[in-house]
Amino acid sequence: PAVYAGKDGYGLSLAAVGFVLMLTRFSDVVTDPLIGFISDRTRTRWGRRKPFIFIGTPVYALGIWLLFINPIEFREVTWLGLEFNIGYPYLFFSLALVYLGATIKDLPYRAWGAELSSNYNERTIITSWREAFGVTGALISAFTPAIIFFLGYTRPIDAVFYLSAAMLIIMPILTLNTLIVCPEYPVRERVQTRIPLIESVKLVFRNKIYVRYIVIFTFSGIGSAMTNALSFFFVEHVLVAGALYGFYLAPYFLSQIVSIPVWFKLSAKVGKHRATMFAIGWYAFWASWIPLIAIAPNEWFDAFQVHVILGFLPQAWYETIVSQFEGIETGKFLFFIVVMCLKGSSIGALAALPQSMAADIIDVDTRTSGQQRAGAYFAIGGMIGKGAAALGLFVGTSLAVLGGFDQLADPENTTNTAETLLWLACVYSVIPALFKFVAMPFLWNWPLTEAKLHEIQSEIFESPGNKKVENAYSS
């Protein structure tokens, strides 16, 4: 939203951009189950999952190029008597291409990860490492706005241009390395007759523990999307530090990486569901501080001013660095970073642990259906998750606009009232935390513990007719 609706971006309507982003997600209703279903049925010499990742990567890259390295100029046009900005349909089609590529490559990728191990805690290690590398990529990308800030580029549109260009070069190299180095292991199946698509979807939703998981996943996704959609606008308009946004992202992502081993140890000790509950509580506690930061006077945060914190540096270094922040209120912003790092330390757990729990749930289906259908499960989960993200983005931007927020206002001489900015802070932090709290009663007494999973896997292994399904194509 900051690129397409921000005052330093394309200047489109925030509410309309949010609606377009939500609308594009409807394409996943068809593509997600279809890709998951086909991926489960595929047999090639390279495996079930790798061909889709190989095909989806260039589709995704093309979509990113069109979305962020815009080759056309947006303008008002008239078509069939309707006047609108060409930016809206352009956003829709380029984003739909991004989502299509992401579906083709990401769903088999996640299913592949679920099949790498059957061990309760080892699955958490796999998803934790995957999320850690994902956040590392986000961390590297977060340094881009910080670096180009010193080169005079402060707009979000500048940052995404350089990030997209770098990604288009690096992503194919890393993807190819993964496809060559990482193995696909044969899966164990009892039933060789393939289940039709519609029946396959029905069987997924008959898995009661998966439906329970989906409720948790959906509400958490809505909350996360609300926060992500409004993050830049909060920093720009409430903290009046939009030029420093890149400096916030880097430590925020770093806190997620550093905390992952802590959450893994807690998960191994108390179980994945209990650790997830702790993470939600930790997230909500620090989220409640955000509105207080928004309404507190700047004088309260003088101890966090850059010129105070960096006073120990040599004079030449000190003057060079401090001059870059001249005219910017850094005290409240740096205190905000501290709070967000504490809050962000829970994000790694909220990403890795549910994915590991999903891998466990698939074993319940394998015991019942006799087939390893990770693709179908991650496809349906991905479809619902994307829908939740789109809904959260739409709800977040709409609530902000309904509260009177104008994203095009000058932050230095804003027309947004104090009440409007406080409302923006609540929509950005407190309301998303409440959405995540919906998961608590569903996680309490979660039935799929380590002991229960071991029992289920023993039944799968010992069941009559169970055998490995090799990667070579077979009809």
Language-model segment annotations:
Residues 1-475:
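Membrane-embedded alpha-helical bundles of multi-pass transporters/translocases
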